[in-house]
A protein has these predicted regions:
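Short runs within selected transmembrane alpha-helices of multi-pass transporters and secretion channels
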Residues: 65, 134-153, 160-171, 193-208, ...
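Short alpha-helical transmembrane segments in multi-pass integral membrane proteins
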Residues: 1-18, 72-139, 185-242, 298-363, ...
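Alpha-helical transmembrane segments of multipass membrane proteins
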Residues: 30-34, 104, 146-150, 173-180, ...
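Residue-level hotspots within pore-lining transmembrane alpha-helices
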Residues: 20, 24, 28, 57-61, ...
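Small-residue-rich hydrophobic transmembrane alpha-helices
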Residues: 44-104, 108, 141-155, 159-160, ...
Length: 448
């Protein structure tokens, strides 16, 4: 009983702050979406499409953060402080370099990028302007992602939560002032939303840097300990990072193909999908803490050689995810109409959004369990090739073909298109369960 109580407490300590942080960000994103929604369908669709391309960068940085988390958690389990420091700084430098590359691309070629998403000239212009401006968030986002990973592995997930609360409040306030023109500032519309996002992301990063100065004791070498260098087991490192980068980028490209499908169906379809994003973020955010808890708890068990304990912990986390996801699906079904009624958009868009949310509620349990399996459990051993295989098969062998067929061959409406392409989650879940039960994902990382 004490073991179970200790495990549940450990899960709550890690999962609740992460879930609150994600839900908070999604809640404020919903408020931002409502503000942008007052600007009409073109701006709603434009911001949504720009966000889809920016998500490619987000998943690349997330992959780097995930590798950092795998390494830090396992080396903490091994009680190897020098490897913890090396893991953090190596991934931080790589993340900063990739952030700079994406920023240059989005600044120089925003119109060309957005032209791949929509043929509507006005929507493309709005999306290109927004994309160019929010590229200023890429560098601080990289730093904040790595710092959040470090704090969570140190079992201090409240620190990034506090920073997110303050930055989200700042973002919402600035959005209101800049979008609608308050406190003597002229209305800036979508440009105002972008500026608010950049400022709040920079503030978030600076706040976490301040927290690091008081809580980053592991990054400081004690007397007699080796200082952090970039000398490491690069073969092992790239064997973790490259599959994650491939699967995350390929998955994100698949999501962008989905966005392009919606955009080429109609502006109304694209706007309806955009309106569902805050709800999707809230639902996944409410349970994403279980995935983060899995990566830290199971990673430490694997690092210390406790494989049976890791497997038992994984099964308990999957049970928590199954119960929570079914509960949230029911809430989505009963609140969808009230949520859509908030927006000042055409009734056709509202009806589409409600139907899409119903379809989303059906696949939520599979999405959540896949998040815990692929995003936390299976990758915690560092053998990320399994995750790459699962994501590539699900997205490109099932999701994308079903999306293209249902939209352009079968000519189905957007709710049916979304539901059919989301069936890839069921395929992904089946493969993940097979990999999980075979236990070949269990692995202890080597130190230099």
């Amino acid at each position: 009983m004490k073991t179970k109580d200790h495990f549940f407490k450990a899960v709550c300590t890690l999962a609740i702050p992460v879930a609150l942080q994600s839900m908070l960000q999604s809640s404020f994103s919903m408020v931002d979406q409502i503000m942008i929604g007052q600007l009409g369908e073109i701006n709603v669709a434009g911001v949504g499409l720009a966000g889809k391309f920016a998500s490619i960068y987000s998943v690349v940085i997330s992959a780097i953060g995930a590798v950092a988390g795998i390494m830090i958690a396992q080396y903490l389990g091994q009680k190897n402080r020098s490897e913890v420091r090396r893991s953090f700084f190596t991934n931080l430098l790589l993340g900063a370099g990739i952030a700079g590359m994406f920023m240059v691309i989005c600044t120089l070629f925003p119109n060309q990028i957005m032209g791949a998403y929509t043929r509507d000239v006005q929507t493309r212009q709005a999306a290109a302007e927004y994309l160019m401006l929010i590229s200023g968030t890429f560098v601080p986002m990289a730093g904040a992602t790595l710092l959040s990973t470090l704090f969570r592995c140190l079992e201090k997930p409240r620190l990034p939560l506090y920073a997110s609360i303050l930055s989200a409040l700042l973002n919402t306030g600035l959005n209101y002032i800049m979008i609608f023109g308050k406190l003597g500032i002229s209305p800036m519309g979508v440009r105002g939303a972008a500026f608010a996002t950049v400022i709040s992301q920079c503030a978030n990063f600076l706040l976490m840097l301040l927290m690091l100065s008081k809580n980053g004791f592991l990054l400081k070498s004690n007397e007699g300990e080796p200082t952090a260098t970039l000398r490491m087991n690069w073969g092992q490192y790239w064997s973790m990072l490259l599959p994650l980068l491939v699967c995350e980028v390929v998955w994100s490209l698949g999501e962008n193909v989905y966005a392009a499908i919606y955009g080429h169906m109609s502006t109304d379809a694209s706007a309806a999908m955009t309106l569902t994003n805050p709800i999707q973020g809230l639902v996944i955010g409410a349970l994403c803490g279980l995935s983060q808890a899995a990566s830290v708890i199971i990673g430490k068990h694997l690092g210390s050689g406790e494989n049976e304990k890791a497997y038992w912990s994984a099964k308990k986390l999957l049970l928590y995810g199954a119960i929570g996801s079914v509960f949230l699906s029911i809430i989505v079904i009963f609140t969808s109409k009230a949520y859509v009624g908030i927006y000042q958009v055409d009734n056709v868009v509202k009806a589409m959004t409600v139907q899409i949310l119903f379809a989303y509620a059906v696949v939520v349990p599979f999405k959540v369990l896949n998040m815990i399996l692929g995003g936390g459990i299976i990758r915690s051993g560092g053998r990320t090739k399994y995750v790459m295989f699962i994501d590539m098969v699900g997205t490109w062998c099932f999701g994308v073909p079903l999306g293209l067929l249902s939209a352009f061959v079968w000519k189905l409406s957007i709710p049916y298109v979304y539901f059919l392409l989301s069936l890839e989650e069921c395929i992904r879940f089946g493969i993940s369960l097979i990999v999980f039960h075979r236990r070949k994902w269990m692995n202890q990382l080597e130190a230099v």
